Amino acid sequence: MGLKKFKPITPGLRHLILPDFSEITKEEPEKSLLKPLKKSGGRNNFGHVTSRFRGGGHKRLYRIIDFRRDKDNIPAKVASIEYDPNRTARIALLHYADGEKRYIIAPEGLKVGDIIMSGENVDIKIGNNLPLKNIPDGTLIHNLELYPGRGGQLVRAAGTAAQILGKEGKWAYVRLPSGEIRLFDLNCRATIGQVSNVDHQNVSLGKAGRSRWLGRRPHVRGSAMNPVDHPHGGGEGKAPIGHPSPLTPWGKPTLGYKTRKKRKPSDRFIIQRANDKKEK
């Protein structure tokens, strides 16, 4: 995977940096693994906006991804590496030996023709999925389960990877991409390797219209609003926000204000918070 830069022959091309899609081997998705995807426009079932600045964008079909990887001890051949409009990572189409087809998140380095497997005692090889208890310390992993059998929920974005630091009793110490160190049950499963599309962080959309194609509407500053719409709004000209610290649109402190619930049950699994040098 590489990046493409463009000659600045128009304003929209001047800062445009896009992936070159050189790893994509198939343009049309597998029809049996598609389903319709309805747009919400950032609204909930009452029609109220719950996620601001969303709407529009190109129509999409949802690709059904296998996050559980529960088809144990059956070899699967990588048939293609494909683009998925619903996520930043690439996806891989697997053809299992029994004839079933499934999509998975493609790890970096996975190629068409590779054979991968899931199971308790499969090899430590990119794309294989197995419990944390059978993965050596120091290994990079992704598609990590929070609870055994629930399917991978963490470390699924482009270029991300977690690392197993050690094991003690029935727990594994895992460093997440945020820097947080957390305990996971040794029976939780994960996939070996780093998520594909590692250059995603260097992509530059180049123009506002490209953001609109992705379904993102303009992100309006609070200071550009009226007082009725935002605590930072109003004033003559470019006025200061008029508060000791920045506030959310709903009047709560922001920028550094801790929003995690106190005494949350999962606190006991967190050994070190992200960017926190002092261990608990």
Swiss-Prot record:
One of its GO terms (molecular function) is rRNA binding. Part of the 50S ribosomal subunit. Forms a bridge to the 30S subunit in the 70S ribosome. The keyword Kinase does not apply. Belongs to the universal ribosomal protein uL2 family. GO terms for biological process: cytoplasmic translation. HAMAP family: Ribosomal_uL2_B. This is Large ribosomal subunit protein uL2. Residues 215-280 are annotated as: Disordered. Keywords: Ribonucleoprotein, Ribosomal protein, RNA-binding, rRNA-binding. The gene is rplB. One of its GO terms (cellular component) is large ribosomal subunit. It comes from Dictyoglomus thermophilum (strain ATCC 35947 / DSM 3960 / H-6-12). Gene3D superfamilies: 2.30.30.30, Nucleic acid-binding proteins (2.40.50.140), Ribosomal protein L2, domain 3 (4.10.950.10).
